[in-house]
Regions:
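Gly-Asp-aromatic-enriched flexible segments
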Residues: 1-136
């Protein structure tokens, strides 16, 4: 429910880290309505997934705003139809704005998975300020 309140049509699996109190935050680092996730274990990432129809426009993009807990970091992995499209460490303790070109999938229905992977297993919470598809 909290994921849908944050951003439909995203679903979540392998939500862990009760000590990090995952869920929806009213505000974090100047953004409102922020989703906090945490990997289930060092080996099992928390996964946000959705089936999306990519707009048939010139340069559709997956747009993310992600951050980390000030005492930790995590690894963001993006998979499209099961294929790795991005692996990036999130460790700046500020919002990182990421745009992933979806032009190759224009007009198609795709499955996107956003993984919150562990990195050294210390304060691995992922903070999501935006997950959207833009039609630029």
């Amino acid at each position: 429910q909290q994921v849908e309140a944050f951003s439909k049509p995203w679903k979540i699996k392998n939500w862990g880290g009760p000590a990090m109190n995952p869920g929806l935050r009213e505000q974090w680092q100047g953004k409102s309505k922020v989703l906090v996730t945490h990997p289930k274990s060092e080996e099992i990432p928390c996964v946000l997934s959705a089936e999306i129809r990519v707009p048939a426009t010139q340069s559709p993009k997956l747009v993310l705003a992600v951050s980390n807990h000030p005492k930790g970091d995590w690894v963001l992995a993006v998979k499209i139809d099961g294929k790795s499209s991005l692996v990036q460490k999130v460790d700046q303790s500020k919002w990182q704005h990421i745009q992933l070109d979806l032009s190759d999938y224009s007009g198609r229905k795709i499955n996107i998975e956003l993984e919150n992977r562990a990195n050294n297993w210390s304060f691995e919470a992922g903070y999501w300020g935006e997950i959207s598809i833009r039609r630029d």
